[in-house]
Curated annotation (Swiss-Prot):
S-S bridge residues: none
Cofactor note: Binds 3 Mg(2+) ions per subunit.
Family annotation (SUPFAM superfamilies): Terpenoid synthases
Enzyme category, top tier: lyase
Reaction catalyzed: (13E)-labda-7,13-dien-15-yl diphosphate = labda-7,13(16),14-triene + diphosphate
Sequence positions that bind substrate: 206
Binding site for Mg(2+) 2: 119
Family under the similarity heading: Belongs to the terpene synthase family.
Intervals of motif NXXXSXXXE motif: 252-260
GO molecular function: lyase activity; metal ion binding
Keywords of the record: Lyase, Magnesium, Metal-binding, Plasmid
Record text about domains: The Asp-Asp-Xaa-Xaa-Xaa-Glu (DDXXXE) and Asn-Xaa-Xaa-Xaa-Ser-Xaa-Xaa-Xaa-Glu (NSE) motifs are important for the catalytic activity, presumably through binding to Mg(2+).
Organism (species): Streptomyces clavuligerus
Stated name of the protein: Labda-7,13(16),14-triene synthase
Length: 343
């Protein structure tokens, strides 16, 4: 972590904390001991953290404890190690305290449910389906069912109540729509454990299983903006929002690869593995290819940020700047969080 990175414009690589090395030609198994390398393009984007980071982190832990969403020791410790409050403080450094606390609690809720239920060993769509139905009911009615078997629906209803106070109606609607896609994606994720999906299918769903599409929708309100429909529909603005969500999910697949391989005892079925299967590549070459996909998206995002920063349309330059900081905080996210660290 203390090594000096090369110039971002040369697109060098920076080492992970620890990683895995893969035998040449091996697409199925990996051996612990080497380093995966992640493209270093972060110097293209600014980065800073909200001064409210510590306060928000503490508040989210209190919120989680109050709702008793995670009572098992293992998932509970991993959730605390995620440091969600500090992560949102990096993504949205200019957000006011109440909005930053809400965003942290929302991501803590999503992560807690994913850790406890979606990632549970052997979970089936039949077991997960009733949870999804209850969440959709909360999205539609704003209230939780009276006899819910877990506190998750009631906690979601509370989060949506707070959203109505903090967001404009259109911003709230966008967040609800993206949450609905998350619930579909959670069911989809269970189906991928018994089949190999295409990279196209994976890339369609991954921004929702990683919650990055939800995160991208929060950039506007967290920057204090209320963009018009015309601005939101602008192709450049839409593509930049998509690039942010894509970069978040792709870089997570790279940075978490070593941790997931170690935790699973096998190669994680994420983007590098899927590229290896689809193209017949050794896993190390497929990992490098996934890194190139990240580089290409980063270059595109950088170009769009430059173009939109010069726009005369109201709110567009400010939105471009907010996205730039959301991208730029990504590398520090993996320095701040202990969730994916090798032991």
């Amino acid at each position: 972590m203390g090594r000096r990175a090369r110039s971002a414009r040369s697109f060098g690589v920076s080492p992970l904390w620890g990683g895995v090395s893969v035998r040449s030609g091996d697409r199925g198994e990996a051996a612990v001991g080497g380093l995966w390398e992640v493209p270093d393009f972060w110097g293209l984007f600014p980065s800073r953290i909200s001064p409210l980071a510590g306060e928000v982190e503490s508040g989210t832990r209190v919120w989680l404890d109050g709702w008793r969403l995670v009572e098992e020791a293992g998932p509970g410790e991993r959730l605390k190690a995620s440091k969600v409050g500090r992560l949102v403080a990096l993504a949205y450094p200019d957000a006011p305290a109440d909005l930053l606390r809400w965003a942290a609690d929302l991501f803590a809720w999503l992560t807690a449910f994913d850790d406890v239920h979606v990632e549970a060993p052997g979970v089936t769509t039949a077991e997960l389906g009733p949870h999804m139905a209850s969440f959709v009911g909360v999205l539609e009615t704003g209230t939780a069912p009276g006899a819910a078997p877990t506190p998750f629906p009631a906690a979601l209803a509370e989060l949506l109540d707070r959203a109505r106070e903090l967001l404009t109606p259109l911003q709230e609607e966008r967040v609800r729509a993206r949450l609905g896609k998350v619930f579909v994606a959670m069911l989809w994720e269970i189906t991928t454990r018994e089949r190999t999906v295409s990279t196209a299918e994976y890339e369609t769903m991954r921004p929702h299983t990683f919650f990055s599409a939800v995160g991208a929708a929060l950039v506007e309100p967290c920057a204090g903006l209320d963009l018009s429909h015309g601005v939101r529909a602008d192709p450049g603005v839409r593509r930049l929002t998509q690039a942010l969500a894509t970069l978040w999910e792709r870089t997570n697949d790279l940075y978490s690869f070593a941790y997931e391989q170690r935790a699973l005892g096998s190669v994680p079925r994420t983007l590098p593995w899927l590229i290896a299967q689809e193209r017949g590549l050794p896993l190390d070459a497929a990992f490098a290819e996934a890194g190139r996909w990240c580089e290409e998206e980063a270059v595109l995002a950088h170009r769009l940020i430059g173009e939109l920063s010069a726009s005369a349309r109201e709110g567009v330059p400010e939105y471009a700047g907010a996205v730039a900081h959301a991208i730029g905080g990504t590398r520090r996210l993996y320095e701040v969080s202990d969730r994916w660290r090798e032991e």
